[in-house]
């Protein structure tokens, strides 16, 4: 059986995902067969695993860090929020059903078996499994039936390292408070802790380490500084959108409306990494900028609801003005569906309005269908005649006159649509901006020249940098025990 360690946080967004990815890369660089695992994730940023089915995009990144094929068993339970209190449940890569918060709490004991089964499959043949928790184990109101944190750790017998985020303040209280609130059994699972996102002279926290050890008895396994390489990794969830810089003045301005159920927005990361692109995330209450050259409508977990919110913000008027001024639009997946004349959901798959008019920028219509398309794809752009690699995760079938001008040939089949003048583009293919040749030609069409970086290589380099930093700042004795 593989060795295993689980990183849990004092809260959400403390940096667990990046630390797990960095540790996976560090272990892989030392020749270990290492695998990531997250029992339960909640995210609309999904990936298609190499063995088919959906997993959280973060676990796909961690598998890349581990230099291992991605598997649905690396993230056996994925919750994809569709409304304020309801989610689609993906179990071992396949749609299990829909559930609201209280109903899901009753389902969790049933899902624990799938989680433990997947953990065994991931551990088989591995030297090391690095597990990521979700949220915080201190949420004792959710402890009964828990499968994401201590409920999993105790059943699987996996020791826990607690991660505290010093950048947000209150890290000592967070760690000591977690110690105080856990019961004896859960507390005994914690082997130590890591301080993450430290800025400045690390020695200034020496007294803090002594204080935490005095209150908890836990050893410190390292104080990790702010990791610049983390900014070059794909964004994990919508929390990140709230703090992304708006970009660089004087560059090509690309506007992205941020809708409540935005999905797979890591599609935009390759554009965000370009030095001559200003990617503007437009929040509620703001207008689409009049000087944007391109507007991108990203994916959505609930197209009809997000389309209603789009109109409520007045962005439909802004978008039509943008097009009249000669601006261009790209819609991906749910964004593509919004660009058509009508979106129908006669079976109530999204659980709300059965039919709504679209933005009518493409002469197409979409009918929601129960069968979900989930696959990795190879394609070729019809706009620029360059290869594309990406993936599809969508419900619905889109058809209409503009589909006679497909934006790509995906797995040998026409996909998407182009307007007659070529300024409006729709596609179901996620990941197209990560295709370097396509991104280069797209930016050239706006007058930008210059060499484009290899996006995949930049992610690989960032992972290696993070692994090197962890090797430098984590306790060498703890690392030696972990990595063997």
UniProtKB/Swiss-Prot annotation:
Domain of life: Bacteria
An example Gene Ontology biological process: cobalamin biosynthetic process
Keywords, in A-Z order: Cobalamin biosynthesis, Glutamine amidotransferase
The protein's annotated pathway: Cofactor biosynthesis; adenosylcobalamin biosynthesis
Molecular functions (GO terms): ABC-type vitamin B12 transporter activity; catalytic activity
PROSITE patterns: GATASE_COBBQ
SUPFAM superfamilies according to UniProt: Class I glutamine amidotransferase-like (SSF52317), P-loop containing nucleoside triphosphate hydrolases (SSF52540)
InterPro entries in the record: Class_I_gatase-like, CobQ/CobB/MinD/ParA_Nub-bd_dom, CobQ_GATase1, CobQ_N, CobQ_synth, GATase_3, P-loop_NTPase
Family: Belongs to the CobB/CobQ family. CobQ subfamily.
Record's function text: Catalyzes amidations at positions B, D, E, and G on adenosylcobyrinic A,C-diamide. NH(2) groups are provided by glutamine, and one molecule of ATP is hydrogenolyzed for each amidation.
Name of the featured protein: Cobyric acid synthase
Native organism: Rhizobium leguminosarum bv. trifolii (strain WSM2304)
Source species taxonomy: Bacteria, Pseudomonadati, Pseudomonadota, Alphaproteobacteria, Hyphomicrobiales
Gene: cobQ
């Amino acid at each position: 059986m593989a060795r295993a360690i689980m990183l849990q946080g004092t809260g959400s967004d403390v940096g667990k995902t990046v630390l797990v990815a960095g540790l996976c890369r560090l272990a892989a660089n030392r020749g270990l067969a290492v695998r990531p695992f997250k029992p339960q994730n909640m995210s609309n940023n999904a990936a298609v695993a190499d063995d088919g089915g959906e997993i959280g995009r973060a676990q796909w990144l961690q598998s890349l860090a581990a230099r291992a094929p991605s598997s649905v068993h690396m993230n056996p339970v994925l919750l994809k929020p569709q409304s304020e209190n309801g989610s689609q449940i993906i179990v071992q890569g396949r749609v299990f059903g829909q559930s609201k918060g209280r109903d899901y709490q009753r389902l969790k004991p049933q899902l624990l078996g799938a989680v433990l089964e997947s953990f065994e499959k991931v551990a088989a043949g591995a030297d090391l499994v690095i597990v990521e928790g979700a949220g915080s184990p201190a949420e004792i109101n959710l402890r009964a039936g828990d499968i994401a944190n201590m409920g999993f750790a105790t059943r699987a017998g996996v020791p826990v390292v607690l991660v505290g985020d010093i950048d947000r303040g209150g890290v000592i209280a967070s760690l000591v408070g977690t110690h105080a609130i856990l019961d004896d059994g859960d507390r005994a699972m914690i082997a130590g802790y890591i301080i993450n996102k430290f800025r400045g002279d690390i020695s200034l926290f020496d007294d803090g380490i002594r204080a935490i050890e005095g209150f908890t008895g836990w050893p410190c396994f390292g104080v990790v500084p702010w990791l610049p390489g983390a900014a070059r990794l794909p964004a994990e969830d919508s929390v990140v959108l709230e703090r992304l810089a708006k970009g660089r003045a004087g560059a090509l301005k690309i506007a992205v409306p941020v809708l409540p159920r935005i999905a797979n927005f890591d599609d935009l990361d390759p554009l965000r990494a370009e030095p001559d692109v200003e990617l503007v995330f437009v929040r509620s209450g703001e207008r689409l900028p009049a000087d944007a050259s391109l507007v991108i409508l990203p994916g959505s977990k609930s197209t009809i609801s997000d389309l209603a919110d789009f109109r409520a913000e007045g962005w439909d008027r802004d978008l039509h003005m943008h097009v009249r001024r000669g601006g261009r639009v790209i819609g991906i997946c749910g964004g593509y569906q919004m660009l058509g004349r009508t979106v129908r959901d006669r079976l109530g798959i999204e659980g709300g309005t059965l039919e709504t008019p679209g933005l009518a920028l493409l002469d197409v219509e979409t009918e929601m269908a129960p069968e979900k398309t989930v696959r990795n794809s190879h394609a070729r752009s019809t706009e620029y005649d360059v290869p594309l690699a990406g993936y599809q995760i969508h419900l619905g079938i889109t058809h209409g006159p503009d589909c006679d001008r497909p934006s790509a040939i995906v797995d040998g089949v026409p996909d998407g649509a182009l307007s007659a003048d070529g300024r409006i583009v729709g596609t179901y293919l996620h990941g197209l901006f990560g295709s370097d040749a396509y991104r280069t030609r797209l930016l050239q069409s706006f007058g930008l020249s210059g060499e484009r970086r290899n996006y995949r290589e930049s992610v690989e380099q960032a992972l290696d940098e993070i692994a090197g930093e962890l090797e430098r700042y984590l306790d060498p004795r703890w690392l030696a025990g972990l990595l063997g």
